[in-house]
């Protein structure tokens, strides 16, 4: 249970490595990372988008495969190569007319710290670093890449009366 008024939430922003994918990365022969993504996380992201909850990514990484996957699932804001994530976060708020208390940010490590100090509802996977776990309003029982995004989104959609509330829920 998230101890926050989830009715206020209009957007959920995710980091990628350690949140949407596991903490480990395989490398291809060119030195590029290969990530494994959770299908149930993907289902929840596309459902949230259909139900009007904005989902976004702010990551330091750069992967065309990640961009394509999440845009396919309905994300309109996929920010990559963000060396200072807080600047991208502030731009996101301005562009969408949102305030900190409208946002859940799901992060797992120190590069997420500044944003998580600002947002109304900071959340993290169970395997996040200690500093992030301590500052989170909600620590998912799921590890990054293993259902954490689904867990957070399902709690938000249920609280807003949008989980399985329309025929949109029963397909991709």
Predicted regions span which residues?
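Non-catalytic pre-domain segments flanking phosphatase-related domains
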Residues: 1-16, 162-172
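Asp-based phosphoryl-transfer active-site loop
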Residues: 7-25, 116, 149
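Short coil/turn segments at beta-strand junctions that form active-site/ligand-binding loops
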Residues: 8-10, 53, 101-102
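Conserved functional loop/turn residues at catalytic and ligand-binding sites
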Residues: 13, 17, 52, 74, ...
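Acidic active-site catalytic centers that drive phospho-/nucleotidyl reactions
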Residues: 15-17, 41, 108-112
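A positional/architectural concept
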Residues: 20-51, 59-60
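Mg2+-dependent phosphoryl-transfer enzymes with acidic/Ser/Thr/Gly-rich catalytic loops
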Residues: 34, 72-73, 77-78, 86-172
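Substrate-recognition element of Asp-dependent hydrolases with the DxDx(T/V) motif
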Residues: 45-68, 79-80, 116
């Amino acid at each position: 249970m998230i101890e926050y008024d989830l009715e206020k939430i209009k957007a959920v922003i995710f980091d990628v490595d350690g949140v949407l994918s596991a903490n480990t990365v395989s490398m291809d022969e060119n030195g590029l990372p290969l990530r494994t993504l959770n299908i149930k996380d993907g289902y929840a992201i596309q459902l949230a988008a259909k139900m009007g909850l904005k989902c976004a990514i702010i990551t330091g990484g750069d992967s065309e495969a990640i961009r394509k996957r999440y845009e396919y699932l309905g994300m309109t804001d996929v920010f990559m190569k963000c060396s200072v994530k807080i600047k991208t976060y502030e731009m996101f708020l301005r562009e969408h007319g949102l305030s900190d208390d409208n946002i859940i940010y799901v992060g797992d490590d120190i590069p997420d710290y500044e944003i998580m100090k600002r947002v109304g509802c900071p959340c993290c996977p169970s395997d996040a670093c200690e500093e992030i776990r301590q500052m989170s309003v909600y620590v998912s029982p799921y590890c990054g890449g293993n259902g954490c995004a689904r867990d957070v989104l399902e709690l938000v959609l249920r609280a807003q009366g949008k989980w399985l509330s329309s025929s949109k829920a029963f397909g991709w």
